[in-house]
Amino acid sequence: MSKNTVSSARFRKVDVDEYDENKFVDEEDGGDGQAGPDEGEVDSCLRQGNMTAALQAALKNPPINTKSQAVKDRAGSIVLKVLISFKANDIEKAVQSLDKNGVDLLMKYIYKGFESPSDNSSAMLLQWHEKALAAGGVGSIVRVLTARKTV
């Protein structure tokens, strides 16, 4: 009986953690090329008064896969600057111009803005949140709050 167990001990060589999807793997940072949105492009769109293009430029190239908190903070401040510069009447049109992933990304930045409120940012972010919720639904909030990769 023991001879049979010793000879067929292959089951002990299986690494069960290899198949666990929740296993933490400290991989190399794949987002070294992700420097966040281009601040010059965003500023030029803001100066020209093209707010929707400024929002699109600010949401382009998000630093999701980078571990550098400085890059994430810089991208967050750029997006927050764009969101605050919108007029209340233009918010809904801008949110409607985004696709589903864009609305989810916008929600991530809105919640990041809620983390560190400034002078007038909370009131504007609440307006943005209302319009983004109308466009993306409750699922957008759930996807943001359960996402592992943050902005």
From Swiss-Prot:
Pfam families membership: P16-Arc
Region (Disordered): 21-44
Entry's localization field: Cytoplasm, Cytoskeleton; Cell projection; Nucleus
N-acetylserine modifications at: 2
Gene3D superfamilies noted in UniProt: Actin-related protein 2/3 complex subunit 5
Broad class of where this protein is predominantly found: cytoplasm
GO molecular function, one term: structural constituent of cytoskeleton
Listed GO CC annotations: actin cytoskeleton; Arp2/3 protein complex; cytoplasm; cytosol; extracellular exosome; extracellular region; ficolin-1-rich granule lumen; focal adhesion
Coiled-coil region(s): none
Post-translational modification: Polyubiquitinated by RNF128 with 'Lys-63'-linked chains, leading to proteasomal degradation.
Source organism, top-level taxon: Eukaryota
One GO-annotated biological process of the protein: regulation of actin filament polymerization
Keywords: Acetylation, Actin-binding, Cell projection, Cytoplasm, Cytoskeleton, Disease variant, Nucleus, Ubl conjugation
Purpose: Component of the Arp2/3 complex, a multiprotein complex that mediates actin polymerization upon stimulation by nucleation-promoting factor (NPF). The Arp2/3 complex mediates the formation of branched actin networks in the cytoplasm, providing the force for cell motility. In addition to its role in the cytoplasmic cytoskeleton, the Arp2/3 complex also promotes actin polymerization in the nucleus, thereby regulating gene transcription and repair of damaged DNA.
Family, similarity comment: Belongs to the ARPC5 family.
Record text on subunit structure and interactions: Component of the Arp2/3 complex composed of ACTR2/ARP2, ACTR3/ARP3, ARPC1B/p41-ARC, ARPC2/p34-ARC, ARPC3/p21-ARC, ARPC4/p20-ARC and ARPC5/p16-ARC.
Associated disorder: Immunodeficiency 113 with autoimmunity and autoinflammation: An autosomal recessive immunologic disorder characterized by recurrent and severe infections, early-onset autoimmunity, inflammation, and facial dysmorphism. Features of autoimmunity and autoinflammation include hemolytic anemia, thrombocytopenia, hepatosplenomegaly, leukocytosis, neutrophilia, and elevated acute phase reactants.
Protein name listed in UniProt: Actin-related protein 2/3 complex subunit 5
Organism: Homo sapiens
Phylogenetic lineage: Eukaryota, Metazoa, Chordata, Craniata, Vertebrata
